[in-house]
Every structure is written in structure tokens, then in C-alpha cells.
């Protein structure tokens, strides 16, 4: 993976998420509430179910609608000022570009009309040589933009047409960027960081052109700040501009069919980048004797065969996003090789300008660069003019400490708790694409991406080390769906494939060639107990089916136990009557006293006694007449249930500690007749486990009682088992506050 700090500062230089759709946010709009946490997650899921997030129906980032905000500004005669990404030091960065850094001294925010007369959004079209890097270390982003400019139809999906500094100008622009499985529409104001009336970051070779600077600002807004863009991989930018999936190739050990893969990539309109990897910071941006920059992101912009000395020579066109410093070896702008090529080919290919773009032979490319990255485009990205051979599916998921962050196979006790996904590959590839002759194989590209790390860098977040393992499904487990496989499966069966390495990069991917059949993919962090969100994408050359292996939320509906006073021993009756008094019923406080007196003899549990919340849940569960109290028979039934749950707890407490490990919670709840999917389990562990991922007996009982009560409420109101109920606000408040 490539990380580069970008061009050094000159010695004289001193400077340097989606929710509801109702109203726009910004200086020209009314303020609205924003969703956070679980509410935001549920709302986003609902929006995606309605098709929001597709490119033709992009989700408005931060609930900001470009059309509504621009219309409001035009109506009021104001220029847009973005409250979500203000023209303030906080938008520049947090450390090297932080408010107290000398790198940001004398930076001012200016609109293009304050910098130059008659600014243009786009001037005479767009080409890879239009853009130059500023002082920010985001050469990877510029290399991606440079590659994007070679495919205008893709570029104008990211940079919507019809934007200018003249017609309907209101100081607001917008861009569409792919983020972790969905397209988002990002608006920005046109206040840009400058010094001495010159742009500090990305800028065009033409001083009056501003589309690239505004696109960089939109990407910085998504990432939280400009500094968050420092360091990265060209493929990250290409994926976010196309929604495609990346593959990496080490050129010291290139696959035998690499040239064929390159030709296919060009045919499929794939976008490409390359670099010379470094092993230490001292090598960053040092030059080779052929004027190539180490640790720097280049874009690959073309492939051409030419007649040279009686044979065909394959040339590759490469671009340095700095817009200068070019390869000076064979086939460079002034190389003698061009003199032996037909003049019409020279005119077509050769442009002797210092624009950062150059040609080199395929062999020199292999000898000088160490990493090639190819971004394969997905069918929804491409129009009819382009070809794509991929069928795609994707899933979003989370690793959560204590419930679904099981770590890699080195941790068999928790590995099985990771999210699980199943894929069916019924059909082999076409014979002409199968280099293995008569062996039927299915090409499958699996890509695992962790989400939102750039935005969290300001809080010190680091990329997790991630990877995945793939298992072939044995016959006895085929066609199953609503089940989360347990530890025994993974200790019995061997894996069938895996990501090449576990690595702390945004994405890991592997292209696998598998026999037709069913497979299970387990994505994980390397170490357990690491929180992260992820996107898993599966690309196949033929039709495939896939789904998440997870439990369906379910509770056994057991017959209510019946008891009579004849079943009760005299000590039990005597104790109840003492606590209940003359009323013969007990409320929440009496229930708490009674249970805690009866539980004294249970020495095998670590307990501080039953809390009031747990006792309220018990009354909610057992109270049939709505009185808020329990009679003798109701209490006896409750006590029998509690004893049963105690037995289950004791059975699962294998180390006899009187507590449970949070990863065992799923097994305990299943033994008690309830099955929960990953999303619900994550909530339970977050609520009931302590910092050491331990659940004591009190928390277990409180959790289980709440589950039983909520299932009972829901199923009572859903007699036809539709899986949905409808509540008014009043009913919702009544049930949640009481339950």
C-alpha cells in the first residue's frame, strides 16, 4: 500500500453522515435534527431498501440537498456557506495542519471570484494533465483523478455537468462519490484555502479552472478534514470515484498472464495506478536515475502496440500527478526510439510537453515499478459503451467487541462469532476464459473493506488488520440459511481459501478460482475484540447467489406452566405471605425483597441481588391482569422459570466463576429458547456486558427478562406472524417506558 506525504513545502512557505431526507441543512436552510447511532443505522437501512444510494438516486451527505440549498441561496441573494465543513482551521486538519501548526499560518479562505476575474469550473474539457498537487500528501487522490479523466463518462458521474460561476451561481457546487456501498451527493461551498492568492492544495494547470480543487474539497469533507487525505492508495480514490473493486499485483513477481490482464483491463475500461514501493521514510520521494519518484502514486492512462524494428513493441502510458518530472528512459518524450516509428503514430502518441505524462516499454514498466493496481468497474458503473464481466453482491456488517469481533482462526474460541456469509457458485466460467483446460472453475473476486477510518483519524483511529477465510460447504450443511455456524464446524473442517494476507489496509481482496459449489466466507480482524464496520463484496464472472448466515430472531412459545397451592411447600407459602401481607399480592418492591431473601442460598452466582429494573420486567412478564402486581400462583410460575434459567446459567459457566463471557451469551440464550441475529446480539452485549466482557447473573436475568417481555409484547400484537406491528407514538411510549 502506498503512502506519500506529497511534495515538500518550499523553505519560504509557512503554511501548510446520511440521514433523513426532509429538509436541507446549511446557511440557507432551517436547522434540522440529525440521526445518531442506532437510529441513523435503521434509517439508512430503510433508505437503502427504497433504492437510495444508487448512482441515479444518491443519498444527500449530511442531509444537504444541492438543489434546495442553491435555490434558497438564490432566493435570498446569498452565497452558500457550508456549516458542515466551515472555512475554519478545523476543516484543514488536526495535527500537521492543526490550528496551532505553523503550516497553516497565513492561510485564508477565498472564493474563486476573489482570486481571479472570470473563474471557470471547467475550461476546454478535462484531461489528465489538468491537475497539479499542492502541499498536501494526497498524490494517490490526484493519480485517481488523473485516471478518471481518461473516461469522460465516468468522470461526469462524479463531476456533474451544468455547474459554473455564471448561470445560477450561488457559491455552491456538488459531486457524487461512492462511499462503502452507496453513492452520496456531497455539496461544498467554493471557499478554498489560499496563500498569496494561490490555492494551497490541488489546483489546475490553468489558474482560472477550479473543478479539481472543489472535488478535492468534497472528498476532504467526506473524510473530516484536508489532513485526513494525507497518505493513501490510488485504488482507494479509484474505488470511491467508480464503485469498482481493486486488485493489486507485485511486479517483482508478476503473474504470467499480466499483459493479458492489462489488455482486458483496458478493454473493460478499468482504471489503473502504479508505484515504486518504499521500505523507509528516507526513501519517500527520492528519485531513480530515470527520474521516477519512489513512494509516489502514478496513474496508468494507456496501452499501445507499435511497430518497432520489425516487431511489435507494447508501450504503457503513465502520468505523474505533479504535472512534471517524467521518465527519461526509452520511449520518453525525447527518446530516439520515436524516430523509428511511423510519423502518424508519433503524432497520435507523442506530446513533447512537461505535463507529467510519458510512455515507456512494458518491460521497462515491469523493471522499474513494483506495484500495479487495477480498479475493475461494476455493471452499474458502466454504460452500454463499456463492457463488464462481473456479477456483484455486497453486504455491510460490523465487528463488535464482545459479540461479533472474534478475530482470525488463531482464536478458535471466538472465531465462529464473526459474521458469516454464504455464496453459491452453480456455473463454471466460459471455456475460453478458463486457462485450466477441461477443469471447470468459477472465478470469484472477494473484497473486504473497512469503513470510515479516515473520518476517525482525528480521534486517533487506526486501520485494523483485516482478512477473510473461505470454507467449502459439506453436503450436510448445503441449502441451509437461517443459522449461524458454531465453533464445532470450524474445528472440524479445513478452509478452502483465504485472503493472501491479513493487512492493515482499507481493503484486502483476492481473486479465487473455485470448483462450482457452496462456500462460506468469514471476514475478520486479525486480533479479536476490535471494533470496526466493513463492506464485503463478491464479484463473479457468472451468476451467483449469496446471503448472510445468521439466525432469525425467534422465541419458543412454550405452554405456560401450571401450578396449584398443593405444589408449594409450607416454607415457600409462609415466606410469600410474610412479604405480601394482607393484600395477598406483591408489587415490585415486595418482589425484590422476596427474591433476594430466596436467592441467598444460591452461592454459585456472583450477584448483588435482583435490581428494581429486573423486578419490573418480571412483573411485566407475569402480570396478566395489568394490576402491576403478582399473586401467589403467578409468583410460583415465575420462580420456576427463574430456577430453570439459573440451571442454564450454571451449565454454561464452565469455569465456575459465577459469570459468563459475553461471546457465550448467544449460546446461553439459545439454550433458553431464544435465537437472535448479530445486530441484536451486538446491542445486548453493549448494554449488559462490563468493560471486561463479563456478564454477571443479575445482568443475564435482566437481559433475558427484557427479551422475553419484548417478544411477548410483539407477538401478542402480531397474531398473524407478519413480522411487523404498527404503533402510535403514545402506544410506543407506553410500551417502551413500561417495559
Swiss-Prot record:
Residues 1-34 are annotated as: Disordered. Its EC number is 3.4.22.-. The active site is at 139, 296, 320. GO terms for cellular component: acrosomal vesicle; cytoplasm. Residues 379-551 are annotated as: Domain III. Pfam families: Calpain_III (PF01067), EF-hand_8 (PF13833), Peptidase_C2 (PF00648). Residues 552-567 are annotated as: Linker. This is Calpain-11. It comes from Homo sapiens (Human).
